[in-house]
A protein has these predicted regions:
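Conserved S-adenosyl-L-methionine
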Residues: 136-251, 256-258
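Accessory nucleic-acid engagement/destabilization modules that flank
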Residues: 1-47
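Conserved phosphate/pyrophosphate-binding and hydrolysis machinery centered on Walker-type P-loop NTPases
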Residues: 22, 26, 94, 114, ...
Length: 269
């Protein structure tokens, strides 16, 4: 199936980077997600820059620095960072070797993530994450059955705005979206994702994963911000273009974390 084919490609890329570049499982996942953002940006803008020729790939395999591919992807990443400023910093860079980058592009260039069915690409990415998310951060993730139970208990409606102020990799938001899809035959998924689902997380690399999950479901405006939701709630509402507040809060905050910043604490006295 398309889902299995995509999942196989994702796994091959992850395993290649992990085996050849000496990165931790967490770093490998972070780099792979960066590459997916570059790929989707290239498709969205019809740039056709996310490519590697047979000649370039063969030269890379001999150990030569192939400047054409390195420069092409570097420029593409700069544009990608501009497009997704909420989850990328200007000084973010690709931290995998040229050969691993070439391998990744070679595996992905023949497929279109935007034109793949939502189910195929979404499920492939979800299965891929289920294999790798827990490698470095499993203790922070709420089990899926618990998330689904909480969402079903709240019975979200298509017109309600939902926020997770500690969204992690987007488990509650994805579960809410699935609930809405399963209970509303004519749901406009793209509109719901753009207008009704909001997520905040202080960790940029985890926020990227949440954004990628929703991008693969509905390519468009995705309201995931990397920010500390305890610090400036009014500013956050403005940046989310939602000054009215939210109908539902679905979250499992990191209760184990200790806050010592007096400015933050003063807001809750």
């Amino acid at each position: 199936t398309k889902e299995d084919n995509l999942l196989r490609k994702f796994e091959e890329i992850h395993d290649y980077i992990y085996a050849n570049d000496g990165l931790s499982p967490q770093q490998t996942l972070e780099e792979f997600v960066k590459i997916l953002f570059i790929k989707i940006f290239d498709e969205n803008e019809n740039l056709n820059q996310f490519t590697i020729s047979t000649e370039e790939w063969n030269e890379l395999k001999t150990g030569k620095p192939v400047n054409s591919i390195i420069e092409r992807i570097a420029k593409l990443f700069e544009k990608t960072k501009e497009a997704y400023q909420d989850i990328f910093d200007a000084d973010d860079r690709i931290k995998i070797s040229n050969i691993a980058l070439g391998f990744t592009i070679n595996k992905l260039q023949g497929i279109s993530l935007l034109n793949s069915s939502q189910d195929a690409k979404g499920l492939a990415f979800q299965k891929f994450l289920s294999h790798h998310e827990k490698d470095g951060r499993g203790q922070f993730f709420t089990p899926e059955p618990v998330i689904d139970f909480c969402v079903a208990m709240m019975q979200p409606k298509p017109n309600e705005t939902i926020i997770d102020p500690a969204c992690g990799s987007g488990g509650f938001l994805m579960s809410a979206l699935k609930y809405l899809q399963n209970n509303n035959d004519k749901l406009n998924t793209k509109k719901v994702v753009a207008k009704n689902l909001f997520g905040l997380d202080i960790n940029k690399s985890i926020a990227r994963i949440a954004k990628m999950k929703l991008l693969l479901e509905a390519n468009g405006n995705i309201n995931i911000l990397c920010t500390n939701s305890l610090e400036d709630l009014d500013g956050i509402k403005l940046s989310l273009a939602n000054s009215e507040g939210f109908d539902l809060v679905l979250a499992n905050p990191p209760f184990g974390a200790k806050i010592t910043n007096t400015n933050t604490l003063s807001k809750f006295d």
